[in-house]
Amino acid sequence: MKRIRQPIIAVLGHVDHGKTTLLDRIRRTNVAGKEAGGITQHIGATEVPIETVKNLAGPLIKLWKGEIKLPGLLFIDTPGHEAFTSLRARGGSLADLAVLVVDINEGFQPQTIESIEILRKNRTPFIVAANKIDRIKGWKIEKDEPFLVNIKKQDQRAQQELETKLWELIGKFYEMGFQANRFDRVQNFTRELAIVPISAKYGIGVPELLVLIAGLSQKYLEEKLKIEVEGPARGTILEVREEIGLGTTIDVIIYDGTLHKDDTIVVGGKDKAIVTKIRALLKPKPLDEIRDPRFRFDQVDEVTAAAGVKIAAPGLEEALAGSPVIAARSEEEVEKAKQEILSQIQSVVISTGKVGVIVKADTLGSLEALSKELQEKNIPIRKADVGNISKTDVMEALSVKDEDPKYGVVLGFNVKVNEDAEEVAKARGVPIFTGNIIYKLIEDYEAWVKGEEEKKKRELLSKVTFPGVIRLYPDERYVFRRSHPAIVGIEVVEGRIRPGVTLIKQNGQKVGVIKSIKNRNDFVQEAKKGEAVAIAIEGAIVGRHIHPGETLYVDLSKNDVIILAKQLKNELDETDIKALKMTAKVKAQQDPFWKAV
């Protein structure tokens, strides 16, 4: 028997833009008030029955032609995008739909952009809640009022300010490749993003938001939401946690089938599939929050998707957040589920032994997302695993550092660095990058690589000798001093010269070292093709070693040529290459190596 399940809704957005406050308003509980700094600390799930939506939405429900058949909405209260990234189902996102909360006064922030990128990559449809309209100067507040009613009560100036802020948001979405508009102006919901102006604090606009979520889910996701009620359950672990009297439990979102209290389940572990039998199924009543510590769980016989459920069972200590849960009713199903889970873990948790970065993340889903981003940017991975950054990770990065310094690093998403790991990293110079925004984490790493390459280039440039060919002026007037040191006027014919380089004659004989270069009245550190300068040559005597009108060459070592060809190729311009070829011709008289240059 098939029926439509509740859509699973994720709430994303930047810190303090109002994600938890919005869910509170829908739930009429006050979770945000209990959280440290008003920020959601844990992952939770809340079931909102369709009756509650209808009561909140009132006459607005009639905006949708035909009856809404959904049993309700299942909200995941995520700490921003990290949890969304972690929560996967069969390679895609667990969420059917998302609400992106944006503070209309602050606009786009780093985690807003990260959230949009994640939603785009997962192809998850979303609605925008433009929050905190109550902070617009002079905004008249009526609690829980539909936005379309509330806007009519505002004066012209407040309405105009809202309009300006909305257009700023619409412009930002356009820059990211999305057509967006205020929800009541949207012509086609498949092509345009709907923006609902709301005040999560006072409930303004929340009725429209709920109607849109329910209506869009019904209209566009109906086929996806059809489940086989009697089929074996599938879900994703939100969190693994200790509960007094129950031991290690897992909070799970069931998105398919029905889970029974005596079912055998297969769960994703650190490097294995865990097979265990359910001891108790604990389900909160609608409108109560899984993660509320004051809540006493009800034991239930079965749970049908979509639902948030706590499972108590033996052997869950090594279960991984973000990994799959599959119910199995026969030995054959157990084996099949084990293979499926193992292949999923093995595709994400990797150890190649090749030169590449070390990647650590808090859950399987976030590890998969981070690895994917790195692969798209052609950054090789040596090891990708779940868990905090350990001393072993640092030592492995150290071995890579010896082969290729730019990959001898550890990247950690939403994880801590163990104390001993930090000590070794500092002592041995292994960079550790951590953060909770994937693109920012990769950006920081790329900026470091760029900085290191620039530093290396500067070091090489200071050590390497560039090719240069000069000609002494034929007129004796340009011989300013004959010796100790010889000072002569020259023209740079090809390439460049710097103080400290040795000069050689046409026959390869060394004549002296350039001590200084003077351009008119100033001493300079470099002279390039076409420049006329005076140079002081230590060790040369005019008339004995060098003569007016003579061509001289900057002496190069084989090492100079190798560095220039391999590491500083982009620093050589056309005239440098000409100078190199001319010098190679001179040096080839004594060493066949130079014939190949």
UniProtKB/Swiss-Prot annotation:
Region (G5) residue spans: 199-201
Chain positions covered by the region annotation G3: 77-80
Domain tr-type G: 4-221
Any one GO molecular function term: GTPase activity
Residues engaged in binding GTP: 13-20, 77-81, 131-134
GO cellular component, one term: cytoplasm
PROSITE patterns: G_TR_2 (PS51722)
Start and end residues of each stretch annotated as G1: 13-20
Alphabetized UniProt keyword annotations: GTP-binding, Initiation factor, Nucleotide-binding, Protein biosynthesis
Pfam families named among the record's database cross-references: GTP_EFTU, GTP_EFTU_D2, GTP_EFTU_D4, IF-2
Annotated segments matching region G2: 38-42
Positions of region (G4): 131-134
Family according to the record: Belongs to the TRAFAC class translation factor GTPase superfamily. Classic translation factor GTPase family. IF-2 subfamily.
Protein known as: Probable translation initiation factor IF-2
Species name: Thermococcus onnurineus (strain NA1)
Annotated gene: infB
